[in-house]
């Protein structure tokens, strides 16, 4: 197992010198930067004592304005003021155009198909806008900490895809930041509460911000968090609470529903102030123009109950997706300023049967957790500890799939500890067992990779091919010990094995395996594509053959059966050769000629399943 020391050779810190690293919560509405100082992780304030930086950027002809002043100017200068740029990260021009009126910007395209916002300074990409926010946070940190940063841990939503994560890294680099790691926001929140120090358990992260809601279910095993499920609502947040209160004011004050933008902002500000006051008070006097009224907490609860219920529905769905029960969730962490609302906390406590963790400011908890991780990755000593080393996986870890192919689960050079999971399914109807073959290497075929271990998952409930869901999880702890577990999500049956993945491999052998992967990359790709087409063809042939035996006589006439059989024979013959393209095309032809047959079988199955049942019985 290769060890990567954080400090560069010859640049190691002095025994009592700390290397400056920060955690950054790059949020949709607000952003923060935090650092570990005197053993405590805390957010860093600006010159005015404010720790929260609104994620707003306004472009002038000769300067860039970031933060509260830019946010205030958004209504007067909408085309040059960018809000919620996080929603655009990693997206294409087509994606952002689908958002329509939600984004009041003038978009222009480029050769890369990346959306550019037309401003007085010229076209600005989401990466550039995010970089301007990060630059302010970097400068704040270096000014407060009194030195240059060695790096930052930046948080991202758990559902961010590769392009969104890469865009975040690009923005950091443009802002002059070295990214030590991108950390999932729910994981950062759990770290802030020290939940990573527990042996194991299931944790829920309830994140209700100004404009979005996210729920994440994490499993902790051996100090490693695995994201089991995510969910939420991109159109649900504290802003909706404000709009509900504003509508109440309009109704109670008998105001016209047609309010100009300036009056609308004042109305929403009054609503937001009332909401915040009711966090501690049972009632509050609300003033808007000449109107005065009283809003009680009970009335507020009634106004926001539909929105709170929507968040709880997403929570239940996320927990159900993991295959666990609500009672198995051992801790619930509250994230986002909107979780200060008492009714939200009450509802979450009622759902999970335990009081949520709220001791840390919900606006700051993600940045605080990221700072703890950054301090560790920077190589700073813990009390009484030695210089921390960051371990990496030298070769990819994966498993065998049909056709003798290597499916990588954890890529090489991934830092540990780490846990990754993927879902697989059965290949044949009625399959009740699955062989798990764990491999190490960079090649596409298992014959060119190193076998680490084999084990079996037995007791899979018999069902049609592709219906079972088997989640295979790879976990490497801080000592480089690999644990692989397989769990059938429906029945809960599980099997696992442990192995030391680097055992028996010298540095020269690792180098040789890497060299071979580069040298034979082209041949490997061709071989993999051929195998994949052969596997797809074989799977289709077996499925069609089984369908013919079960329902061919009942649902097809003689001519239809003859056409299907001729296409099957043609595909079997092509599978004996090495023309992957021909196999692919014939597989498509067979699929096309059996489409009508498949539709008839589906209709027949649905009719049988719904016979004697009403709509209420089949709804959630």
UniProtKB/Swiss-Prot annotation:
For this protein, the record's CDD domains field holds: ASKHA_NBD_HSP70_HscA
Q: Which Pfam families match?
A: HSP70
Q: What's in the keyword line of the UniProt record? A: ATP-binding, Chaperone, Nucleotide-binding
Q: Which GO terms describe its biological process?
A: iron-sulfur cluster assembly
Instruction: State what this protein does.
Output: Chaperone involved in the maturation of iron-sulfur cluster-containing proteins. Has a low intrinsic ATPase activity which is markedly stimulated by HscB.
Q: What's the family? A: Belongs to the heat shock protein 70 family.
Q: What is this protein called?
A: Chaperone protein HscA homolog
Species whose genome carries this gene: Pseudomonas savastanoi pv. phaseolicola (strain 1448A / Race 6) (Pseudomonas syringae pv. phaseolicola (strain 1448A / Race 6))
